UniProtKB/Swiss-Prot annotation:
Belongs to the G-protein coupled receptor 3 family. Glycans are attached at N30. This is G-protein coupled receptor family C group 5 member B. It comes from Homo sapiens (Human). Residues 349-371 are annotated as: Disordered. Residues 1-28 form the signal peptide. It is a multi-pass membrane protein. Expression is high in kidney, pancreas, and testis, medium in brain, heart, prostate, small intestine, and spleen, low in liver, placenta, skeletal muscle, colon, ovary, and thymus, and not detectable in lung and peripheral leukocyte. According to PubMed:10945465, highly expressed in most brain areas examined, with the highest levels observed in corpus callosum, caudate nucleus, putamen, substantia nigra, thalamus, hippocampus, and spinal cord as well as in dorsal root ganglia (DRG). It is found in: Cell membrane; Cytoplasmic vesicle membrane. It holds the Pfam family 7tm_3.
């Protein structure tokens, strides 16, 4: 009995020790895990769910919503593509897809600045930042060239020319980014994350040139005789102007703000992540949505008659939908022509059409009915102004007092 009770006590002690060990390990894991994240989440992705660093969750939500809207716009444009018949609206569809692809890349790159950096993440950041912005700015520059042609001449460049120009302009930034990575990482064998903020900004000078040229060319899209395309130019100008403001703000904060606020590198990643999300939404709201809306609008009916244009003959629709020209409502009245008036005077007995000279020895004859009929013949307008009745001369009128 004594041995059995001793064994039970030992078993209870072992179970109590195991329970305390489990509770202690769980408490230590909870203490090391950020609030809002799971236990099995890698430390690299803690910023995506850490409630103590709320900026990551906010920027993540904004970027995710922007990515969904961009995908929806691409799907709408793809579905409605067979119904776009107008040549000037169908030619830039490829450019629109390219621009939406670059905007989607900006929203996706935002997550690379939220998670913790390593060698791979830093290389992706340094390469894709300049390339994606170069793609978007190149598409905006090609669009500015197209709208300027449409406003001035009424016809734009072909679709392959727009896409080719955008890709060629983007290729320059690809070469710059590759050279920067090769010279600093491969040749000098430095870590990919070991770079100064000034070096990062200097590698983006070409993007700044594209943005400034786009802003300058967008100003000329507001001048031209084809006014139906000026609204596209206005939205393009707004997009370029807001992009300039965003770039000035983030470069000021990235280069000087963190130093002045004595934050070190703590705010570098939030600054760049917010810049990507804000730029993506500017591109979507002020360029992608207006352009796609304009592209999907039905074409104008060029053969529709303008009933308010008096310089054109009026048209009416017959039962067979044939256009028949009608006479003008303001036809010239020829009843008062001088030839008919002189003929009427000769008929009344006045030689050579002279009203004031009578032949000697004769009082002449009273003007006959043809004379009175030739004096005045009302026009259609006179009938309308007279209330629909034809004005006639009184019975005692002799026809002598014509004016």
């Amino acid at each position: 009995m004594f041995v059995a009770s001793e064994r039970k006590m030992r078993a209870h002690q072992v179970l109590t020790f195991l329970l305390l060990f489990v509770i202690t390990s769980v408490a230590s894991e909870n203490a090391s895990t950020s609030r809002g994240c799971g236990l099995d989440l890698l430390p690299q992705y803690v910023s995506l769910c850490d409630l103590d660093a709320i900026w990551g969750i906010v920027v993540e939500a904004v970027a995710g919503a922007g990515a969904l809207i961009t995908l929806l716009l691409m799907l709408i444009l793809l579905v409605r593509l067979p119904f776009i018949k107008e040549k000037e609206k169908k030619s830039p569809v490829g450019l629109h897809f390219l621009f939406l692809l670059g905007t989607l890349g900006l929203f996706g790159l935002t997550f690379a600045f939220i998670i913790q950096e390593d060698e791979t993440i830093c290389s992706v950041r340094r390469f894709l930042w300049g390339v994606l912005f170069a793609l978007c700015f190149s598409c905006l520059l090609s669009q500015a060239w197209r709208v300027r042609r449409l406003v001035r001449h009424g016809t734009g460049p072909a679709g392959w020319q727009l896409v080719g120009l955008a890709l060629c302009l983007m290729l320059v930034q690809v070469i710059i980014a590759v050279e920067w990575l090769v010279l600093t990482v491969l040749r000098d064998t430095r870590p990919a994350c070991a770079y100064e903020p000034m070096d990062f900004v200097m590698a983006l000078i070409y993007d700044m040139v594209l943005l400034v040229v786009t802003l300058g060319l967008a100003l000329f899209t507001l001048c031209g005789k084809f006014k139906r395309w000026k609204l596209n130019g206005a939205f393009l100008l707004i997009t370029a102007f807001l992009s300039v403001l965003i770039w000035v703000a983030w470069m000021t904060m990235y280069l000087f703000g963190n130093v002045k606020l004595q934050q070190g590198d703590a705010w570098n990643d939030p600054t760049l992540a917010i810049t990507l999300a804000a730029s993506g939404w500017v591109f979507v709201i002020f360029h992608a949505i207006p352009e796609i809306h304009c592209t999907l609008l039905p074409a104008l009916q060029e053969n529709t008659p303008n009933y308010f244009d008096t310089s054109q003959p009026r048209m009416r629709e017959t039962a067979f939908e044939e256009d028949v020209q009608l006479p003008r409502a303001y036809m010239e009245n020829k009843a008062f022509s001088m030839d008919e008036h002189n003929a009427a005077l000769r008929t009344a007995g006045f030689p050579n059409g002279s009203l004031g000279k009578r032949p000697s020895g004769s009082l002449g004859k009273r003007p006959s009915a043809p004379f009175r009929s030739n004096v005045y013949q009302p026009t259609e307008m006179a009938v309308v102004l007279n209330g629909g009745t034809i004005p006639t001369a009184p019975p005692s009128h002799t026809g002598r007092h014509l004016w």
